[in-house]
Amino acid sequence: MSYAELQVTTHFSFLRGASSAQELFETAKALGIEALGVVDRNSLAGIVRALEASRATGLRLVIGCRLDLADGMSVLVYPTDRAAYSRLTRLITLGKSRGGKNNCLLHWDDVVAYTDGMIGILVPDLPDDLCGIQLRKMAELFGDRAYVSLCLRRRQNDQLRLHEISNLATRFKVRTVVTNDVLFHEPGRRQLQDIVTCIRTRTTIDEVGFERERHADRYLKPPEEMERLFPRYRQALARTMEIVRRCTFSLEELTYQYPEEAIVPGKDAQASLEHYVWQCVPDRYPEGLPPDVLKVVRHELDLIRTMKYAPYFLTVFSIVRYARSQGILCQGRGSAANSAVCYILGITSIDPSTNDLLFERFVSQERDEPPDIDVDFEHERREEVIQWIYRTYTREKAALCATVTRYRARGAIRDVGKALGLPEDVIKALSSGMWSWSEEVCDRNVRELNLNPDDRRLVLTLKLAQQLMGAPRHLGQHPGGFVLTHDRLDDLVPIEPATMKDRQIIEWDKDDVEALKFMKVDILALGMLTCMAKAFDLIREHKDRDLDLSKIEQEDSVTYAMIRKADTLGTFQIESRAQMAMLPRLKPRTFYDLVVQVAIVRPGPIQGDMVHPYLRRREGKEAVEYPTPELEAVLGKTLGVPLFQESAMRVAMVCAGFTGGEADQLRKSMATFKFTGGVSQFKDKLVSGMVRNGYAPEFAEKTFSQLEGFGSYGFPESHAASFALIAYASSYIKCHYPEAFCAALINSQPMGFYAPAQIVGDARAHGVEVRPVCINRSRWDCTLERIGNSDRHAVRLGFRQVKGLAVADAARVVAARMNNAFVSVDDMWRRSGVPSEALVQLAKADAFLPSLKLERRDALWAIKALRDEPLPLFAAAAEREMAAIAEQQEPGVALRQMTDGHNVIEDYSHTGLTLRQHPIAFLRKDLSVRNIITCAEAMNSRDGRWVYTAGLVLVRQKPGSAKGVMFITIEDETGPANLVVWPTLFEKRRRAVLGSSMMAINGRIQREGEVVHLVAQQLFDLSGDLTGLADRDEEFKLPAGRGDEFAHGSPGSSDTRDKSKPVVAPRDIFTPDLHIDTLKIKSRNFH
């Protein structure tokens, strides 16, 4: 008997289904099921994944949706044709617009308005009067397309329930059909389905009750089993295939039409594009197009005409032109940088006359895939561009792609642990010990946490968390992938409001969009562009020099000298530990060297064993041999090593006779070979083609192995060149305008590898004067202040560094002092009108010290004395009261000031950095007693020396290409030290590695040229040494007891000494205890 399961819920139902479409389709295929109807609740988010699973297995997909209505009625709907599908997507869009984010609010009247051409299956619970009313509605609306589900609930009198539903269906002339309401693909997933129910309902397995499924039967069953379960309803079983035959619609019928663009009057899109290209040529080539570039441009325009992509290029051109008109810094990157047309239009910045790029990497007639242009904008101004796109194309025709937020290790352990009722401290201990998103927790890790690995709930938590990893949690919004259409976008896919105001997203992510060959425009945010724009503004204001990315001096020798020394903290792309370690070895001297530098520190070249051969050849330690002149022409610039994706494509084209389209298919197959195994068909073609062209079989095999090794991670040369431009520009500004770079970098946070504390420390090491936050000098952003009469400038820290201070309050402070500086706390409070809480935050940040000379405690004491502003009605009384105050002035109080160590703690706690001594400096005497040397001494030691050093943990990195090796950067008062932690030590000392704020390391120095690492052999957590750092000062030899609140800095509590009763009751302002025992250093961890 043929049978189709028409009620299947995938895990794209978000915490309802417990299996993926791939698992469901593969299992259904093995069981002999003819087709699957995917009906996720009020959503089509997973339907493209279901289509791909259907293609992979050859099993028929029936597209559907379960509509759970506001009145409790549930109907499964299946569009029979393209028009009905569009009505379904509009219906879901309507419900999402009403319900808001993660909700869908639909009524029966909505179903009536939109379900023409759909098959409907009522999902009843009990055969009662309500069921009869619903069946009558179904019959009236759907007619011969109305069905009712017969599904076992495994309750008492289940067969009687089915019999009565069947009788009601006959009475209202609605046909019955068997469904199994599948939630998981095989019985073993029942426990996970219970857990996701607990997560969704925010309860525990002990309390979930009847919210969970009452039976374990919600898995796929073979047709024979379904026939055994429903022996009296053979016709209802057969109707499953009847519905499959009636539903002829497939997602492959969706035809995407790009929106019409504003074009030159009297010209079509292609002619308009060519008009703009030739119009923009003088901007890029004032002396005319070089002949070779002219040839490339004509080739590209011909291909664009053939592929009908002109509207897409016009769209991106319009967006970039708008951004530039608003002074928003932007630059295209990715494969689009291979295009001469994109360069001439100003979309990208890679000149094809100086860079040998490959257009087929971007657009290929054989590939028949839409182009993909990524444009980066300043991250603080990108929203202006996004809203312009919405205004220009309308919200009916424009929306962002979704991103699928999936469970990773920590999130899975947290949610599963809560669902199973584990104590919060156990959950925290387990999740905090995880590093990578796919990492498993072994028994030894559990024992290290002093937990019992045999505890049943703990074991079940780890097992189910592993099953949950990778499952969708919810939909988010793509950073900037826009889908634009000619007709209504909600005819193609449901649209829902995003969490962020004035944005909307489709239910599909970028992979879904690419699978259906929709075009998208990526409007991305890049923090370094924001930094560069702010740096240019500061330079223009204070240095009287008008700079932008195109006006920066190229090939500046001083800048490259700085780069070769790895003095690149804060710059773009070349600031990471791995990049800094590579710079002294690669020694970039030209822009192309920088392109190689950006690309070589990637998993691809490392896995393809290309880094060391390239470096040896560059240093002259290994000869470069090319079997043929053709190969030398392709790989000459990279010394015979195929470092880029374009290199792999050119080798295939020149040496093996591939066409441009075939070469790009080779690249794509390598990128997915781990998952699809599709690379083997190209291996034979590549090897045989190279042998046929005179290359030795061994050389051909070696070439393919290299390409295969880096294919999945290889970097496009065009992408590397785009990034190298910004890397060079940021390095140039850091080199020649370090104060502007420092201020701009802090003003653009959060971004990059390093926190403001390290940025400021690096700037000071380069001779930049950094001044503290000041109520009379600071603005919201960091600014530059002239040093005396010189042409040098200092960086003044801005109010943005004050934790807890609102932008609006900072703006009120700045506005109030425009004419006159503040002379006291009271003066500032009354003129600015900021709430007292803002004053407290400023006092904690020591912002009253630079101009008012008020230490933290003095400022907080003054804030405590502030009185409420009197109302006009009581002005006379207020005057009398003030006179009384004047007559009975409270005597001045001499507060005991904080120690230097205590001030450092407060600096870190309230501004994230300190301009005083480094915290480790206060511990140096004790560390020296333990034979712990400084980081500088360790990094200057000879190769092979054993050293013992310590510092604050700044950055932890564990790249996927490093085979489990972790790289850590620590810092003391003398500078940073770079650590290497092998996997065995990491597993032994996991808690110390992941949980330390301060760490001691015993290890051996590894020196290769100017690159120095400390290879750790032992690790110790010294975070406890930071406790009570306030006491580490000569002035604090005999610290007062904790009971002496005055000495310990607790202005929020009362003074127990006798005080005269004040004339006017002071206004109580809550001020937390200033004595923070532990310095908390927030490190940055990168995966």
From Swiss-Prot:
Enzyme class at the top of the EC tree: transferase
One Pfam family recorded for the sequence: HHH_6
Keywords, comma-separated and alphabetical: Cytoplasm, DNA damage, DNA repair, DNA replication, DNA-directed DNA polymerase, Nucleotidyltransferase, Plasmid, Transferase
The reaction(s) this protein catalyses: DNA(n) + a 2'-deoxyribonucleoside 5'-triphosphate = DNA(n+1) + diphosphate
Main location as per UniProt: cytoplasm
EC number: 2.7.7.7
MF (Gene Ontology): 3'-5' exonuclease activity; DNA-directed DNA polymerase activity; nucleic acid binding
HAMAP family linked: DNApol_error_prone
PANTHER family for this protein: DNA POLYMERASE III SUBUNIT ALPHA, ERROR-PRONE DNA POLYMERASE
UniProt family annotation: Belongs to the DNA polymerase type-C family. DnaE2 subfamily.
Protein name: Error-prone DNA polymerase 3
Native species: Agrobacterium fabrum (strain C58 / ATCC 33970)
The encoding gene: dnaE2-3
